[in-house]
């Protein structure tokens, strides 16, 4: 089949590779004129990295990314609440990777061009809409002209034009008041060089992790960090810029944080470029598929970045879509794909609104009142593991059966 994909992000490119592997003719259309390796840190969870390994990208990932050993959840005083392992040594079939989002996107882009041809990704083509009938779908562009295909996959992100046409009466983005500041800084490594720290609580939170294997080989660490501050009276989401240069007033919220190996205020102050944006998602959709058109990735299920799951769910979408179309070509395959993925991602979106695996931070914050308190006296390991295991079940990354 000839399949058009709107969007050359991680989901759209992963779908291109998976669909090409099944013998389909794929054409990707990207709105921006020039693709650039934008973004900062991203995580690929074990279940999603298995898809990329299956596509033959494991060696390339190991050359650029960090194999995450564990996520350490800590109080603002530095207490270790829980260490949640994410590595093959802990029983996962594939590793979790922490890496630069742009490097992952360009790894996928290079592979698409190498396997499908240089013209497989057309930049400067914003998909603006579509029409369809029993025999095919016609894709239209903001720049004019059209493209005929058997299927259209809307992988065009948070502001998806394909989603907009499928659900024209959808309400505004969902925003509860958390602002996020992000940056990356090259510095000395912390911990073992493979650990992610998440500290604080639902109101004030700090996340950091290394994202570059190449920096590690030079004895340094490229540290990706995210600072989150929740406001009691948030402004409307539509008034909040998606991404802009961030102010530095938020740093005052983290002056009292105490982390082993990390001086958080110093890390924040030494970062040259800081971006700021609201934490936004959308309400889950009742359906993704209409005839020969379906949604994928952020276009289908934008979610809060709890559990580092957004890109991973898009990659899983790509594999399930290709497998479903291999069994049932055409609209029936799209419906089969949705039947598998929509319930899972809906559950993830709603769980992430409740903080996902990061609920352990709020459990600890409610009980730990100062640096002298002992976590082991206040919270049982079983209570913490229940949170972690529950989210692994929801998100679909389970350890191998022993």
Residue map of PLM features:
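C-terminal helical "tail/cap" subdomain of flavin- and related membrane-associated enzymes
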Residues: 1, 63, 78, 286, ...
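Conserved N-terminal helical subregion
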Residues: 1-3, 20, 45-167, 171-184, ...
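Residues at the starts of beta-strands that form the adenosine-phosphate
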Residues: 2, 25, 222
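Conserved mid-domain beta->alpha element of the FAD-binding
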Residues: 6-21, 25-32, 153-154, 181, ...
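Catalytic P-loop NTPase motifs of RecA-like helicase/translocase cores
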Residues: 35-36, 161-162, 302-304
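Short, flexible helix/strand-to-coil boundary loops that buttress conserved ligand/catalytic motifs
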Residues: 39, 55-56, 65, 84-85, ...
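Conserved FAD/dinucleotide-binding core of flavoprotein oxidoreductases
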Residues: 82-105, 136, 142-147, 186-273
